[in-house]
Amino acid sequence: VDIGIRFNPNTDAKTIKQISTGKKDNKFGVDEKTFIQLVSKLKKSKFINLKCLSVHIGSQITDHKPYEKMIKAVDKIIKKTKFKFDYVDLGGGMGISYEKNQKELDYLKYSKVIEKFVKQHDTKIIFEPGRSIIGDTAVLVSKVIYLKESYSKTFVILDVAMNDMMRPALYGAKHQILPVSKIKTKKSSNYEFVGPICETTDKFLSSKNFQKLNEGDLIFLCDVGAYGSSLSSNYNLRPKSPEILINKSKIKVLKKRQRLENII
């Protein structure tokens, strides 16, 4: 049987705490000592072929330096084991810009880190760049169903909720919200965009500089291509949203809106 072992390099990805996966107190992978012991045992096995070293330090990483530290740890462990891996899976985590003016990963610096490693090790490299490919390919379109004035803010209650886009409620991720129709109008003083679910965490964004909205207006929740649909659920007995593919002038329905009878 061909297998791989996931190594925990004890590297801080400098990302959202809940999606950091490469520190020693995270549940993923094995530490250096255990990894070396496993490789030593598997070298002698007649039935198990160790093929791959795998590592993944987290998601939504926007700085090349954590990758640099991770690569140094991988290089060190390979030299310590003196084992020739057919594959080294360097994971993913390459971040995108979710907020206006948010820093993005410098791919030139990232590639130089990888290039240096490749020159030292004759092995095939595997990457998992999911978010960086599809993250900005989708938007969630929502309608304003109610405006609720409350103390010092206005709640903009949308017809989408945390069941449709879980990231903000799950770990405080920020997604830009834009009006579908931009008009010159008075800016809001304090909008809080929320869903209609019975959870305080059913909140998307607070904005102090948004165009004035009315019931029935449409907004975009941006960059939902990664972990949007895959994290969606029927929580609160809410049917899942439809998914539509737009390719230039062509429109294709990928998933129809769920009906209540499909859930029950």
Q: Where in this protein do the model-derived segments appear?
A:
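Active-site-proximal beta-alpha core segment in soluble small-molecule metabolic enzymes
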Residues: 1-87, 96, 113
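Charged (often Lys/Glu-rich) extended helix/loop segments that serve as interaction or gating elements
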Residues: 113, 122-264
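Flexible loop residues that form catalytic
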Residues: 58, 93, 224
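Acidic/histidine-enriched ion/cofactor-binding microenvironments in catalytic or ligand-binding pockets
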Residues: 1, 76-79, 83-85, 105-120, ...
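General structural feature for long, well-ordered alpha-helical segments within catalytic domains
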Residues: 31-38, 49, 63-73, 86, ...
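Short acidic, glycine/serine/threonine-rich loops at helix termini
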Residues: 13-20, 64-66, 98-103, 136-140, ...
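Generic beta-structure capping elements
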Residues: 6-10, 93, 161, 196
